[in-house]
Amino acid sequence: MAKVIGIDLGTTNSCVAVMDGKDAKVIENAEGARTTPSMVAFSDDGERLVGQPAKRQAVTNPTNTLFAVKRLIGRRYEDPTVEKDKHLVPFTIVKGDNGDAWVEANGKGYSPAQISAMILQKMKETAESYLGEKVEKAVITVPAYFNDAQRQATKDAGRIAGLEVLRIINEPTAAALAYGLDKKEGKTIAVYDLGGGTFDISILEIGDGVFEVKSTNGDTFLGGEDFDMRLVEYLVGEFKRDNGIDLKNDKLALQRLKEAAEKAKIELSSSQQTEINLPFITADASGPKHLTLKLTRAKLESLVDDLVQRTIAPCKAALKDAGVTAAEIDEVVLVGGMSRMPKVQEVVKQLFGKEPHKGVNPDEVVALGAAIQAGVLQGDVKDVLLLDVTPLSLGIETLGGVFTRLIERNTTIPTKKSQTFSTAEDNQQAVTIRVSQGEREMAADNKLLGQFDLVGLPPSPRGMPQIEVTFDIDANGIVQVSAKDKGTGKEQQIRIQASGGLSDADIEKMVKDAEAHATEDKKRREAVEARNQAESLIHSSEKSLKDYGDKVSEADRTAISDAIAALKTASEASEPDADDIKAKTQTLMEVSMKLGQAIYEAQQAEGGAAGDASAESGDNVVDADYEEIKDDDRKKSA
């Protein structure tokens, strides 16, 4: 049987591994290295270079050497992160035909999936050279906070590279697999993964072959690239102060500075001081200029201290979501090249109150975990159960713009959840299902993943139709949503496509905004719930007044009409006040009591008590929002 390989497709470096008997083994590339730079370059004559050869010529060919492209994968061109990256990289980021962020080399545009595919091809060739056979299947890792668009784009990259991607697995989870495969006793561990482009923290319970993720969190704007750029900015500032020359717009100089910054950062993990020496960095009328500077570990730590501190909040959030304290964590596993930095290790020790575990290679452990998962799928690794989670809540927009969650964040996947909704208007023949992801109370504040229509509902009173909405998330974290009218059996479904995915900026913004706006969100939700209750009361009161108004006095009819009008005004305000709506709702209920009594007496007179009224079929169903979709609009959104 052909081998299934495990690939860690990293922002800065990539790594490939395979099961060799009962153990996972990292495969060395053609250059003899165990990791490969995630870089692709195009020479003037069109030659394509991948990995170390691309890195070697980056200084002389900065505009056509592409790196850290993983930051762009699955992102729209207008994404705030893309805007930030445009000013940090020497190559050009352009808008693709589909509106995604693409990169340009030698005047030709490439999608990030294409560039990633070139790196995956290098990994595939490395494995084929070692195994002596063709490789067609792989397990590929992604950051835990990657969204649907990014996961789908990663699968596309695998397909372009000639690989069938059997599974997309989260990087911290893969690391936990490699760490805990031979651990029999139960443990609660934290995987602290600070890599080249992203930061993830996952809390897991492991033991006797079971790996259960309890929670995950992260910061998708944080990684080694940010540390490098902080040092580059410092070097640019120092050089400008000493020489009066700004190197910001000199792409050749910036590429040299970036390489020097990365080298100095690595050296300072094992020494207290290093020297950055870049001769002929630029020139002016007086002649060539050289950059020579001594950099201490203390200075580097002061430059990047806020970046390191930014890892603390996600860690605390993950602990809270998992329902454990730092003291209850048995082991903290460090993953990612940046976790070698002494300052990072010091912060981790302070946060968790224990020395972090350094028994795994932070550059290789993720690929090893991917290989183990490949072995599980292939049947070579027995008695291993992996339970991962979805990082953000998923739900739909319901009446009043409320975000109704169907699947809460940190729910174990794969998972399937259904809930029954109904219509908001009489004789409503179509509903629009808007699928959103996030942590805010109002749908508009979360990210719209996609929408679709369920049409052909038979005319009936509001609240009567039973519409079952089902969310289905597979083991790759890819979402599918369906809606079915229980009465007619009509059904529609949507698979969230890459163009509708979330950006990293959106995900981080959702969680942080949710915390910052918790009070505001609560007030707005209360107002919407009060308005929904008010509209229901108005509807029933108007109907009762029309049918039985002649049973009460003119004064009572006027009082009820005035109370209905006042409640309508309060509930239709542009900034509805929950307390005002509740007060006017109470007033309407009180003035309607005589009408209710008259209705009861009329029914008694007609034939006695009707007995226990049958429960209204719309009870316990959440009202779904309604929007008429014209054919032209439907075509545009398709």
Swiss-Prot record:
Q: Quote one Gene Ontology molecular function term.
A: ATP binding
Give the superkingdom in one word.
Bacteria
Biased composition (Basic and acidic residues) is annotated at 514-529
Where do Low complexity bias regions lie?
605-619
KW Flavoprotein (keyword) present = no
Which UniProt key words apply to this protein? ATP-binding, Chaperone, Nucleotide-binding, Phosphoprotein, Stress response
InterPro entries in the record: ATPase_NBD (IPR043129), Chaperone_DnaK (IPR012725), Heat_shock_70_CS (IPR018181), HSP70_C_sf (IPR029048), HSP70_peptide-bd_sf (IPR029047), Hsp_70_fam (IPR013126)
Q: Which residues carry this modification: Phosphothreonine?
A: T198
What SUPFAM superfamilies does the annotation carry?
Actin-like ATPase domain (SSF53067), Heat shock protein 70kD (HSP70), C-terminal subdomain (SSF100934), Heat shock protein 70kD (HSP70), peptide-binding domain (SSF100920)
Q: Region Disordered: start and end of each range? A: 514-542, 605-638
Tell me what induces its expression: By stress conditions e.g. heat shock.
Q: Which CDD domains match?
A: ASKHA_NBD_HSP70_HSPA9
Q: Which Pfam families match?
A: HSP70
Which HAMAP family does the protein's record reference? Answer: DnaK (MF_00332)
Q: Extract the NCBIfam families matched here.
A: PRK00290.1 (NF001413), PRK05183.1 (NF003520), prok_dnaK (TIGR02350)
- Function, please? Acts as a chaperone.
Family label: Belongs to the heat shock protein 70 family.
Name assigned to this protein: Chaperone protein DnaK
> What is the originating organism of this protein?
Rhizobium johnstonii (strain DSM 114642 / LMG 32736 / 3841) (Rhizobium leguminosarum bv. viciae)
Question: What taxonomic ancestry is recorded?
Answer: Bacteria, Pseudomonadati, Pseudomonadota, Alphaproteobacteria, Hyphomicrobiales
Gene designation: dnaK
